[in-house]
């Protein structure tokens, strides 16, 4: 059960999975996440821009009863320049604090639909703060796993 874990416990577990499965794990900090969001928003491509505020049909949510997360990176067609799961299958914890909250959540998750949980969403204490202009957000850490070559 991962529902009752600390951020650090989950961080150590993810790091261990990466080492034990011969994959490279890289962390993307808030500034890098925001740069990706900014690039998508300003790309001139309406599909990429829309992904930052409405990921309907792109996010890894079940689309049914909201009780079925799917494996990270399992739907390759949802990648944007090899970046997976930006609309999330589960929320990610940020390493930076947000206000008085030590860790905030970013991205939607399997119980969201695409417009209530897009890539740019931030959540703290169960409330959502939608950021339509993603470069205004400031804290996120995202773990990406890829096979070692």
What are these language model-derived features?
Residues 87-97:
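Active-site-proximal beta-strands of protease catalytic cores
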Residues 1-85:
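Short aromatic-cysteine micro-motif
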Residues 33, 98-99:
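Surface-exposed, flexible loop/turn segments at secondary-structure boundaries
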Residues 4-18, 24, 28, 77, ...:
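Disulfide-stabilized, aromatic/cysteine-rich ligand-recognition loop
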């Amino acid at each position: 059960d991962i529902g009752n874990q600390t951020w650090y416990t989950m961080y150590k577990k993810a790091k261990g999975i990466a080492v034990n499965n011969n994959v490279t794990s890289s962390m993307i900090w808030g500034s890098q996440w925001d740069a990706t969001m900014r690039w998508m928003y300003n790309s001139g491509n309406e599909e990429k821009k829309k992904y930052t505020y409405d990921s309907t049909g792109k996010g890894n949510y079940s689309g049914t009863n909201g009780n079925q997360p799917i494996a990270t990176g399992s739907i390759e067609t949802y990648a944007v320049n090899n970046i997976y799961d930006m609309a999330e299958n589960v929320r990610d914890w940020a390493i930076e604090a947000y206000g008085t909250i030590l860790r905030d959540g970013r991205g939607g998750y399997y119980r969201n639909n695409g417009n209530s949980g897009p890539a740019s969403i931030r959540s703290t204490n169960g409330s959502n703060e939608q950021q339509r202009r993603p470069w205004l957000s400031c804290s996120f850490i995202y773990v990406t796993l890829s096979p070692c070559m």
